[in-house]
Amino acid sequence: MVRSGKNGDLHLKQIAYYKRTGEYHPTTLPSERSGIRRAAKKFVFKEKKLFYVGKDRKQNRLVVVSEEEKKKVLRECHENGPGVHHGISRTLTLVESGYYWTSVTNDVKQWVYACQHCQVAKNTVIVAPQQHLPMVGNPWSVVTVDLMGPFHTSNRSHVYAIIMTDLFTKWVMILPLCDVSASEISKAIINIFFLYGPPQKIIMDQRDEFIEQINVELYRLFGAKEIVISRASGSVNPAENTPSTIKTFLSKHCADHPNSWDEHLPALSFAFNVTHLEPNKNTPYFQMFNRNPCVLECPPEEGSEGTSVFARIVAAIREADGVVENKTPASSQMENNNSDELSKSKVVKKKAKQLNPFHLKVGHEVLRQRKNWWKDGRFQSEWVGPCVIDYITESGCAVLRDNTGTRLKRPIKMSHLRPYVRESSEQDSLYLLQGSIVADHDYIGLPEIPVGTYQANILVEDATIGIADNELLISSKDHELLEYRNSKISALVEDHSSLEKQTFSLLDSSNQVLEYLS
């Protein structure tokens, strides 16, 4: 460790001189000799060169002293390869792996900060070109492509399906695919081009490398260049994607017809296009061609199986779409309210905290709860005392005094207190009330002791305290003493009007007084 203000190179020279000669360098101060001896244990000479081995003696770092050698090391570790400049962390790791000097960390930071190449590269921000999506104002201008599958392999070896949706008209085309390679998808897109022509842009939710392969195939087959773009640019509202009704119905159709699901895809596409999938809007067919198709509806003949396959498909699509439309805002609002009420009913009501269950007041004797050992996954507690309530804070905590009159440091919650009930076997229980402090000579000077099972009586509201009969005292002196005691007890009874049982026995106390006077 180099002291503050000392040259690090001089420190290494002093260590090298001490390791080589066994004596201290002339510049070494007497106060530095012990530090030189301790530091020298971390260095060794190998082939007339000083190496740092560390405390574990497992390192092997060459000690560099001169400024020229430091610059050479920094240049080699920072510029690792043609045009490659490491940052501070990587450069420092490379330097510390083979070299040592005292200020290596600061030197690496200053070297990287002063590197012109790093500063220019840091301030250069490469912004990806933003793709401007043309405004969707005409049919078949912007089309989205979604892939679904894998489904059960059909008789024609088809496993996947491609869905092309026009964002303006919601016109849908569904084609089967054998796989999801770039060439297979490009061929399906080209077949749609031959029917309706190429759109301005095609949006796909795929990675950029895969989209680039599709663009290459489309340029090779059709001559369309960079027509497919990624949906990750955020230029398309997710609500404008393929309607969920189409995907849900297609999944159900493929599951119901595992071997022939690809045979009915043209019928499914046409059925979707002539159905009102969006309320208050024309069908996709009308928006695409500005007219409605001529649909021939012939009544089924007697003895026939019923309506045609296409009619059943249209009916199933309308039924599936009607389930979605019937979910009105009022019903959805009602469901939300029901869910809110259900969630509220599931909330477990916490039991209200009993801040002062025993109605304790200033001057009452209490026991306090102390948690002092860990057992069975929780702290175990015991009741210690007695203590006297000195005063009660605004937050409802009690400040206590122990049996020696010393005030405890921390306020105690009222829920951590319980009344102290004196046993008949104890000594004289005559209380001398002094302001808000109760002094009892029975336990003055005694330490706080844990109270066990003998604490049997618990005080509750509406406590009644019996008063000893005055006939037990014969002399006038005894009578005066009893009146004094009863006057003090009556004040205590007013404070304990909510307690149920007797806090101390007056009868035993009077008997003890008689024995004392006799």
From Swiss-Prot:
Keywords, ordered alphabetically: Phosphoprotein
Gene3D superfamilies tied to this protein: 1.10.340.70, Ribonuclease H-like superfamily/Ribonuclease H
Pfam family, one: Integrase_H2C2
GO biological process, one term: DNA integration
GO molecular function, one term: nucleic acid binding
Positions where Phosphoserine occurs in the chain: 498
InterPro entries listed in its UniProt record: Integrase_cat-core, Integrase_H2C2, Retrovirus_Pol_polyprotein, RNaseH-like_sf, RNaseH_sf
SS bond list: none
Residue ranges annotated for the Integrase catalytic domain, each copy included: 130-292
Name of the protein this chain belongs to: Gypsy retrotransposon integrase-like protein 1
UniProt organism field: Mus musculus (Mouse)
Taxonomic classification: Eukaryota, Metazoa, Chordata, Craniata, Vertebrata
Gene assigned in the entry: Gin1
